[in-house]
Amino acid sequence: MEINYITDNILIQDNKMLYHTKNTMKPIQHHNWHKVLNECGWTKLSSKWISKLNKQLKNPAKNSLFGCLDCGDDGDCLFHCISHALNNINDERFQNYDSNDIRKLITEHITEEQYLQIIEYYRILKDSQEFDETWDPYSIHSKDDLCSEIMKGGTNYWGDFLLLQLLQSILHVNILILTNDSHNNIYEPYPTMNEYNSSYNTIILLYEDSIHFKLVGYFKDNNMIYLFTHETIPFEIVKIYSIYR
């Protein structure tokens, strides 16, 4: 019987989350998941997103089961979220991944053709003063130069939809993004331009105010799920993304 401690008070046993209370261990339930799992960083989605998702159901849960986790805010938030989700796979390739591993995977798999497409696009953004990275795409003269920038990490290379396309093909995962723009009151699925693949696992991210990514999870069967199969993607997400199932 495998037992994994998340904190001193929370553990996973037989794919179920338990917490320590009054000298005993109790399963975490639908009504209290947000209170208990707050200890390890999980919080509810914003009320706007909860309302939007609840509208997809005839009888939504009284306590929303969607949560989000801040996996890091040092400029590598996108890569932190993806690595955290992948570490949940029972696959030796992805165990103990971190953000640098994700960046390295990109540099190992990017082709010359992809490099040329990416750098041309970045230069167009630079010309229109819409390039948000701290480096100059005109200083990049080879694929190796671009890979060096990608590997620097932090705020030097945040990641974008081109990088997401690469990650999906490299990792064989779908990446769905929920926009949470409180400044402009936008709460919609983010158009990643990537085709959904039902044979892939799926990672769901929350994109907050155009500057920060968080990992989205769903509490089900006494466990917080944040890496989904085609069958386990929450119905509300299936509806708003029009996924055929």
Placement of each model-derived feature along the sequence:
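Intrinsic-disorder/low-complexity regions
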Residues: 3, 7-8, 13-14, 75, ...
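Compositionally biased, intrinsically disordered low-complexity regions enriched in proline and serine
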Residues: 6, 20-21, 31-35, 43, ...
